[in-house]
Amino acid sequence: MATKLDKPLFLFPTVASNCASVTAISVMYHPDGTFREDYYPNLPEHTFIHTGIIAGSPYALLWAGIGDALSKECEAVFASKGATLKFEPLMGVQLSKVCTEPLLMYGAQALAACREKRVTPELEQVVLDIIVATGLVSNMTTRIPEYYYNSSLAHCVYNGATATQFGGRHLHGEIVALGVLCLLTYDGQLEQRNRIMAFNHQIGLPVCFDELDIDESEFEAIAKRTQAGAEWQFRAPDITEESFIQCMRQQNQAGRAFLAAMQQRGG
C-alpha cells in the first residue's frame, strides 16, 4: 500500500520469522496457498525492533526464522558464483558470510530463551541476524532484471513445495532449512551440509522430505511450480529440472540415513 500511494513506510516486526521487515521483497500466493510471484515494494524508511516483544512471540516462528536465515550465505554465494559483481552486490555477498555462524553458535540458546520469553544476548544476536543481516544482504543482491543473487535452490524447494499435498502445513523457514541441505548437496559441499544437517536435527528442523510430509513422487511438481520464481529464472545454466530433482532425491537419502544413524545411537 505504501508503495502504491508513494508514502514512507515504517515497520515494527513482532516476530523474527524472516527478514521481510527490512527488505524490498514480498512473496505473493494464490488463494489456495501455492506460490504465485515475487513483488518488489519500496524499502521501509526504518525498521524498529523490540527484542522484548519478539521474545514473547511464538516459539515456532523464531525456529522457522532460523531455518530461513540459514539459507542466506549459501544461496548468495552459490547464486553469484562465477559472476563479475558490481560493488553493491559484492558487498552483499560478503555480508552474507556473517549470517550462518551466529545461527549455529547461538540458535539453540536463543530458542531456549524464547521458550522462556527472556531477552538474552543469544536471542538478540539471532534476531538481528534473521531480520537485519539477512535483510541487508537481500537488498544489496537484488536488482531485477539486472541481477538476482539473493536466493537460489533453497528457496526453489520452498516455492515448489507449496504445490505439494501437505507442503502448506509447514512454515516457510522450516521448508527452506531443508532446501539449504539440498543446495549444499547439489554444490558438493557435503562437510558443511552434514554440519548444518546435525544442527537442523538438534533444534528440530527437517533433514529429509519425510519430515515435511512430502513424497518423492511430488518432486516433479515441486520442480514445475518453482519455475515461476526469480530464483529459477536467474539460476546458472547448468541447473536443470532434472538436476534439481536429483539433488532433492540425494538429500532425501542422506537425511534418511542420518536419522537412521541417530536412532541407532539413541539421539
Identify the residue ranges that each predicted region occupies.
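Alpha-helix C-terminal capping segments
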Residues: 1-8, 185-188
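Short hydrophobic "helix-edge" motifs at membrane interfaces and signal-peptide entry regions
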Residues: 3-4, 40-41, 144-146, 230-231
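A glycine/threonine-rich phosphate-anchoring loop and its flanking beta-alpha core
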Residues: 4-96
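Generic secondary-structure signature for well-ordered alpha-helical cores
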Residues: 33, 52-56, 71-82, 101-112, ...
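Active-site segments that bind and position negatively charged phosphate/pyrophosphate groups
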Residues: 86-198
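C-terminal charged capping/lid subdomain of soluble metabolic enzymes
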Residues: 189-267
